[in-house]
């Protein structure tokens, strides 16, 4: 008997599914039959003939297409910035600007060109390394500092630099970096070579070779290599500075719709009248809890949050430590609620409505039984506000409740018989009816000379000649045909 009752209860769902299947079948059949009718009407053949057959006497495809390219060179945009290039990925050059007649060369060598006892060490100030008689001394000094800053060279922790001793006979600036493992840490060489690769945007050719020294010196620019704007961007990004990391305040507590053991609670919360609701026992389902999860801006959500925290804190510990747990729970509750209580206390002092977390109001739909998320009934002068004083709030809440009900009804109906499916069925049926009429009328597809075979792929004019000019005009009568 129970199975029979269950069967009769499922009959509406079975009928609804059958209607959906019927709508899908009708839509597919109408679309397929419509396409067949269009093909049989000759419309596709006529369009293909008009597009292809009259262009030329052959079927040449792609005669108006060609491969083209564009090269982007933004050196004019960065002409006042340092520009770099490379020669065989072993020598690197940096110019101060696009119009500079000098440059700085960076090379890796397997032998030292400067000696520590003879040449001075650099502890941070590069001005003693540049000869005072060198032209563009200030620009060269700035470019050297730019390079070392891009390499993130630490004068305090890295091996000291060696620079050419400034004399009256030497008018060249040379700086040497010892990248051997004996000079610094075991990975100092790999670190510096990797930074060079990042700086110049390429893989260094000497990263696996026994090169032990990096030498930086000034040179005259004689077009050693070709520059591009990508290398300039690498230099600019290497000297862009350090990004400031900001901290964003995250949520302190999170909670889900489960009990203390981690099991789902499909029934939601039932709050007793001594807890929140003063009239009687009221149950709030998962919808209210989901709203609190998405938008935590209600005093009711604050109470649910405290209630959930207390319950989990108490039920997850042993009964032998209940006193300590109670003390801990009260302390945490005080910390959590300090902000809320202080906010309401300030409102009370300012003689503005505040919440005492005792009485809550919500909008209830008497027919469906659905209700809105409870909101705090504000207190002013030690008495609850009259309903007329927050009339706009509960009217707006009722509008939101009706909107949610309409949306829910719409999605429920979409789950049974989607409106889109009905629209597809309607338009596919209309498409089939239109194509059926076109099939009955028919379209001519090409022109024939009376009594002659099919001239395809050539397109004839009214005088019987080939429109592309390959064949002379025969001045014979022509007629339109539907089939070949």
UniProtKB/Swiss-Prot annotation:
Protein's UniProt keywords contain Disulfide bond: yes
SS bond partners: 85-225, 270-283, 292-301, 355-376
Glycosylation sites: 88, 125, 178, 218, 356, 364, 381, 386
Record-marked site positions (Cleavage): 58-59, 250-251
InterPro entries to which the protein is assigned, alphabetical: Arena_glycoprot (IPR001535), Arena_glycoprot_zinc-bd (IPR043015)
Extracellular-facing ranges: 2-17, 59-423
Annotated Gene3D superfamilies: 6.10.140.1590, Arenavirus glycoprotein, zinc binding domain (2.20.28.180)
Membrane-spanning residues: 18-33, 424-444
Annotated positions binding Zn(2+) 1: 57, 458, 466, 468
Record key words, sorted: Disulfide bond, Fusion of virus membrane with host endosomal membrane, Fusion of virus membrane with host membrane, Glycoprotein, Host cell membrane, Host endoplasmic reticulum, Host Golgi apparatus, Host membrane, Host-virus interaction, Lipoprotein, Membrane, Metal-binding, Myristate, Transmembrane, Transmembrane helix, Viral attachment to host cell, Viral envelope protein, Viral penetration into host cytoplasm, Virion, Virus endocytosis by host, Virus entry into host cell, Zinc
Function text: Glycoprotein G1: Forms the virion spikes together with glycoprotein G2. The glycoprotein spike trimers are connected to the underlying matrix. Interacts with the host receptor leading to virus endocytosis.
Record-given protein name: Pre-glycoprotein polyprotein GP complex
